[in-house]
Amino acid sequence: MKFEKYIDHTLLKPESTRTQIDQIIDEAKAYNFKSVCVNPTHVKYAAERLADSEVLVCTVIGFPLGASTTATKAFETEDAIQNGADEIDMVINIGALKDGRFDDVQQDIEAVVKVAKGHTVKVIIETVLLDHDEIVKASELTKAAGADFVKTSTGFAGGGATAEDVKLMKDTVGADVEVKASGGVRNLEDFNKMVEAGATRIGASAGVQIMQGLEADSDY
């Protein structure tokens, strides 16, 4: 198992500078992480810098609120892919989910999946804002919409991934859809908990610390 390929090395802070983007790109190349995950404004630059590597470019859509229109999310997705994005992490319409407007939620996801045309789409449901039944429903809608992953969190809503939520999401979607845990995964212990719960991708700014923990752990 290549643990480095579980990691989307992430920098989504609004104040991120080019120097900081360079740092996570260099780290991702050094450790051969699955991707770097950056805001759309950095996608083109990251794609150019990663062109000679296996590391993919991941970006975020409708982020962090999920409250932009479906048409806006679709355009953002198209623009990101034209700029070199390989993977798309979109935020659902959380208010629509809570209203019970499930068709709206599913159609919002479907619009992004359609524009992404074969690029990996991960759907952020923001678990910290949802109850048990809402997590289940959001996971079901993600699967029905044809997305590749259901993802826990943006990291901007006051909480992140828990192993319990990851397990619930995985139990809901089954083998056809993968689970990405993000938000608060800061060390090897957190990483292991998420993987054991069913996550096959980890979004973290602490990718280097996680890998250093793996290197220091005699079990690996």
From Swiss-Prot:
Pfam families: DeoC
Localization per Swiss-Prot or TrEMBL: Cytoplasm
Domain of life the protein comes from: Bacteria
Pathway membership, UniProt: Carbohydrate degradation; 2-deoxy-D-ribose 1-phosphate degradation; D-glyceraldehyde 3-phosphate and acetaldehyde from 2-deoxy-alpha-D-ribose 1-phosphate: step 2/2
GO cellular component labels: cytoplasm
UniProt xrefs under InterPro entries: Aldolase_TIM (IPR013785), DeoC (IPR011343), DeoC/FbaB/LacD_aldolase (IPR002915), DeoC_typeI (IPR028581)
CDD domains to which the protein is assigned, alphabetical: DeoC
EC supergroup of this enzyme: lyase
Record-annotated active site: 89 (proton donor/acceptor), 151 (schiff-base intermediate with acetaldehyde), 180 (proton donor/acceptor)
Catalyzed reactions per annotation: 2-deoxy-D-ribose 5-phosphate = D-glyceraldehyde 3-phosphate + acetaldehyde
Keyword Cytoplasm tagged: yes
Gene Ontology MF terms: deoxyribose-phosphate aldolase activity
Record-linked PANTHER family: DEOXYRIBOSE-PHOSPHATE ALDOLASE
Family affiliation: Belongs to the DeoC/FbaB aldolase family. DeoC type 1 subfamily.
Function: Catalyzes a reversible aldol reaction between acetaldehyde and D-glyceraldehyde 3-phosphate to generate 2-deoxy-D-ribose 5-phosphate.
Protein name, entry field: Deoxyribose-phosphate aldolase 1
Native species: Staphylococcus aureus (strain MSSA476)
Name of the coding gene: deoC1
